[in-house]
Amino acid sequence: MGAMAYSLLFCLLLAHLGLGEVGASLDPPGRPDSPRERTPRGKQHGQQLPRASAPDPSIPWSRSTDGTILAQKLAEEVPVDVASYLYTGDFHQLKRANCSGRYELAGLPGKSPSLASSHPSLHGALDTLTHATNFLNMMLQSNKSREQTVQDDLQWYQALVRSLLEGEPSISRAAITFSTESLSTPAPQVFLQATREESRILLQDLSSSAHHLANATLETEWFHGLRRKWRPHLHRRGSNQGPRGLGHSWRRRDGLGGDRSHVKWSPPYLECENGSYKPGWLVTLSAAFYGLQPNLVPEFRGVMKVDISLQKVDIDQCSSDGWFSGTHKCHLNNSECMPIKGLGFVLGAYQCICKAGFYHPRVFSVNNFQRRGPDHHFSGSTKDVSEETHVCLPCREGCPFCADDRPCFVQEDKYLRLAIISFQALCMLLDFVSMLVVYHFRKAKSIRASGLILLETILFGSLLLYFPVVILYFEPSTFRCILLRWARLLGFATVYGTVTLKLHRVLKVFLSRTAQRIPYMTGGRVMRMLAVIVLVVFWFLVGWTSSMCQNLERDILLVGQGQTSDHLTFNMCLIDRWDYMTAVAEFLFLLWGIYLCYAVRTVPSAFHEPRYMAVAVHNELIITAIFHTIRFVLASRLQPDWMLMLYFAHAHLTVTVTIGLLLIPKFSHSSNNPRDDIATEAYEDELDMGRSGSYLNSSINSAWSEHSLDPEDIRDELKKLYAQLEIYKRKKMITNNPHLQKKRCSKKGLGRSIMRRITEIPETVSRQCSKEDKEGTDHSAAKGTGLVRKNPTESSGNTGRPKEESLKNRVFSLKKSHSTYDHVRDQTVESSSLPMESQEEEATENSTLESLSSKKLTQKLKEDSEAESTESVPLVCKSASAHNLSSEKKPGHPRTSMLQKSLSVIASAKEKTLGLAGKTQTLVMEDRAKSQKPKDRETIRKYSNSDNVETIPNSGHMEEPRKPQKSGIMKQQRVSLPTANPDVSSGITQIKDNFDIGEVCPWEVYDLTPGPMPSEPKAQKHVSIAASEVEQNPASFLKEKSYHKSKATEGLYQANHKSIDKTEVCPWEIHSQSLLEDENRLISKTPVLPGRAREENGSQLYTTNMCAGQYEELPHKVVAPKVENENLNQMGDQEKQTSSSVDIIPGSCNSSNNSHQPLTSRAEVCPWEFEPLEQPNAERSVTLPASSALSANKIPGPQK
């Protein structure tokens, strides 16, 4: 019967627990009460508020959170063994302590769990006690229970106490007291207790010993504390409706009840058993239950309590409520308190963790909790009881985390960085000063050879390339990291884009394999191409910057942290994939530059600028490759000082070296005399190249350096170009000299048509002409040479040798030509000699060219005399660009500068000079033909043949020592010339007295104005890139040898071995001057008959002017040597007696033009030049106008 009652009671208790949980969920504490219950409940709360505000003596915990108070109380009030057990949890020390009663931890700081949320491990026991109390309240408040006695319900109470231990394992003991009279008897009538002993539950009835509960002690506080305040804090869930209504309310679970707040908590305590403390801390939870009187007034009936073991309950000293709450010793300003779980009911189960930016002075102490060992005895001193103060020290500045006082960030070397930035600022200042210096010397040849705008652009880009070092001096930021890419890429594109485009321009202009003019790349065009490159780089940088800004919105930072091998951190600009792409782009661009350097390696240039640019590009490629490799591999481990030095070294090994390679040679050459380089190399200056033909010179050299081309093709191309240059020269001459158009010629239109036909010669005809020159030189050269030299001393025995001379002159003029600009001054001769093989067109062409040449004779002689004083170096073989540079200093002469370095031009000049000599001899022989015998001419011819036979073998002997000088640089020697013949001046005076040239040729008055007196030239160097003397001028050399043989007393043969005389370099120069003097003397002594000039000497007059017209195309200083001049004078005297003027004159004039056809009379071409016979003075002036003008300009010649 008892077992069934226990089981039934347990089932009812479980059911009540379930219904109570449902009721609690349906009626939460915060739900507003009904209007009927609001007033009395307000009174109950009004009565409870003063109690809550007053200190409750039953609560042993203070709200103080000071850990020092806890340590002091533990040292002063708590026994040593108990305190040691509280800190260590070692029960062996507790057994050695003696006791007379239980020990409670009362009056210690902390909050009671009853006033706040308790420990989670106590929630089960608390809920079990609350539901059991509410079950008793409902049982005692029913009608039936009120009629029954306590003895009848004893079994039910025993079953209830037993069920508490079985339902919650944390409860070690449960008890219930019951009294029928609430206040009349101090002790309860029933006292039932159930105890857990190992695996079984012991149920005891202690009603007989319940009288000890009447005494108020610490052990009975759980009963007397609830009895003293018998009015419970409970509320009626239903209205008072009498017994019937109460039963109805029971069925509706209405009535008086309690919750967790009605449970009383005792402080932790130790039980004393047999004079010693029982191991294990306990806490008692108690709650009262009430019944109803007959008048339905609540009355106290009893108390139910449970004892809970705390050995598995952790003390949280870091929390704000609970036992020992807030008693930690962590400094909240630099550390955080973190509880340690699973240690049980012991103190100090926490650790102080240093906050970010702080560290503990002892590296191996991570917290201030130290579990004491079992053999450790609590001494009772404050030092041992209290927990050691956990102090966290701040880290070094800038360190978010640290373990000790060592710096976590890399310490920068301030002095090193200051020295680097100072030197970098100095270099940037020097770069800016260099821009000003280059602009100041913008008119210098060295600066103009490279281009002022391009040099300034390179220097400006260098400033941008210097900026990354300045940016890295400061702390990295997002803006500085973006600016770093902008400065690097824009500077690289500007500097090396300009250098590469300059090399590209050299490749385009100098390495053209055709003689056709290509579009010239001026500085403006190069800048436009550079603008395209810079625009592409700028567009990429804009896109990259916008993507970086978008990444910042996605929390993708551009600035990160690196760590060195010493575990020191530093801020750095992160490297992304775009940096790799830009490095590859730089590498490919530099490879293109290296290809251009290889392509232009054979191109000569003033100051060797392409060579220095090639060195700069190769240097940039190598240094940049090393720089990017180190940067990409070691960037995250390279500290800022090393990174700054890396950028510094990269900037100066590339940018500074490039600036030095471009500027230092220019200013170093400016102090020396660069004529050697100017003579052998071509300028790259955009100004000169736009006006000169030196680019063709370089293209010819490059073409000859590649032997894959056929010389015949090059010769054909040159012939076409010469014809085009002749037209250009004539147009420019007429444009700059409008007065030349006043003297019109009836054959002018015919001459223009012939010149147009010359320029349109097909390629096949040109090749046929060149082949005929090689195959049929015996016919043309022998005949032309014989006509030239029909004088007693040179005419015989010269038919074979001139053929070889003509062939050599043609070949060497092509091989050794260094500038096609030289031929611009001599296009009249070249263009007239192009169609020589066409026998039918020669007469018409020569007449047209003679008419044009006769108009410009005086004008050319005046310009040649002026050029003699303005050009510092006579016959300097320098590039056309250098001539343009020198000619720009003399803007008053709108003419082409003097050039003479091509051997082909030198050879043609020699032949024209000999033709002029023949013309002069013709005038002399005309007056002496009547008195001369024919046999004398035969005698002189034999003498000439014998002389030439002796000269030819000696020419081979003289050729050998002169071969090493074929392409070398020869120094011009100063040669003194004899003074002018007084007969010439007398002849000129006589001519001026006889007639007034203004009356006959008023358009030539301006041309007869004598030019400035040429100053004596200094001994200067010039370049002669030519073959030996015999190869370039064999006829002149033979004549010179013959003269040396006949005039051995003068000692000129020995002088030629000691030093190179001017007669060897330019043997035609002195000869021309002597011929002009003899011509003037003959003009003054020999009268001209008008009738004879019309009838017999018509062709002779034309020939004389024709030769003079051709002579205007020669440079002013191309004259015959003195030795040959004297020889010609002797031959002229003999020719007066032996030769016939009618037979000699055509040959002498045609020899210079290689022509064999009869010429048109001058009277037919220019009939207005011949006046009636009644004007002898005018007729005389018309006969030799060119000779008169030539004599007038040649009398005040320079003394050399």
UniProtKB/Swiss-Prot annotation:
The chain crosses the membrane at residues 418-439, 452-474, 479-501, 526-547, 577-597, 612-633, 643-664. It comes from the Eukaryota. Residues 25-62, 234-253, 757-875, 947-988, 1130-1160, 1177-1200 are annotated as: Disordered. Residues 25-417, 475-478, 548-576, 634-642 are extracellular. PROSITE patterns: G_PROTEIN_RECEP_F3_4 (PS50259). It is found in: Cell membrane; Postsynaptic cell membrane; Presynaptic cell membrane; Nucleus. Residues 845-856 have a biased composition (Low complexity). A motif (VCPWE motif 2) lies at residues 1065-1069. Highly expressed in brain. Expressed in several brain regions including the cerebral cortex, hippocampus, cerebellum and caudate putamen. Only expressed in neurons, and not in microglia, oligodendrocytes or astrocytes. Expressed in the visual center of the cerebral cortex. Also expressed in the eye, including photoreceptors, ganglion cells and trabecular meshwork. This is Metabotropic glycine receptor. It comes from Mus musculus.
